[in-house]
């Protein structure tokens, strides 16, 4: 099982989710049973968000380079990359990429894409933070808040 950790400067990294490699199911960690939020397609490198009706296609990973792209109207947006050792980085145009966290026991680069798209994608995270004790937080689609400091 791949475990997803958010980097905390000067402290222990926090586990925020995990991926079941047998089925590709993605779960958000919370108090009580973890919440199913989506799945990955290992053959194609695609990531899907679970929702009522058809699941939503979020993005994909270039398995040879570990580059992660979000699905957008027009050209897909480059978000960042996952390294072979499971380290996740957000792309910062004109600057050094930001280290976000890591995956332990990563089986395929698409697991890194799922971590970035579900837990570290600012655009998706603006909808709100995953409610740890409330299943009615469907508006968040399982996204957790970014680790960027708010002003």
Place the predicted regions along the sequence by residue.
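Central antiparallel beta-sheet cores of small beta-barrel/beta-sandwich binding domains
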Residues: 19, 27-42, 48, 56-61
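Long terminal segments
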Residues: 1-25, 56-151
């Amino acid at each position: 099982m791949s475990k997803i950790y958010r980097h905390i400067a000067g402290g222990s990294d926090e586990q925020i989710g995990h991926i079941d490699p047998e089925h590709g199911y993605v779960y958000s960690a919370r108090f009580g049973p973890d919440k199913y939020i989506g799945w990955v397609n290992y053959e194609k490198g695609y990531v899907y968000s679970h929702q009522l009706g058809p699941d939503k296609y979020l993005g994909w990973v270039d398995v040879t380079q570990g580059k992660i792209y979000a699905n957008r109207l027009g050209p897909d947006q480059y978000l960042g990359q996952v390294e072979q050792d499971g380290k996740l980085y957000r792309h910062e145009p004109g600057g050094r990429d930001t280290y976000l966290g890591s995956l332990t026991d990563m089986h395929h680069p698409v697991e890194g894409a799922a971590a970035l798209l579900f837990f570290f994608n600012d655009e998706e995270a603006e909808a709100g933070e995953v409610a740890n004790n409330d299943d009615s937080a469907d508006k968040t689609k399982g996204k957790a808040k970014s680790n960027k400091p708010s002003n």
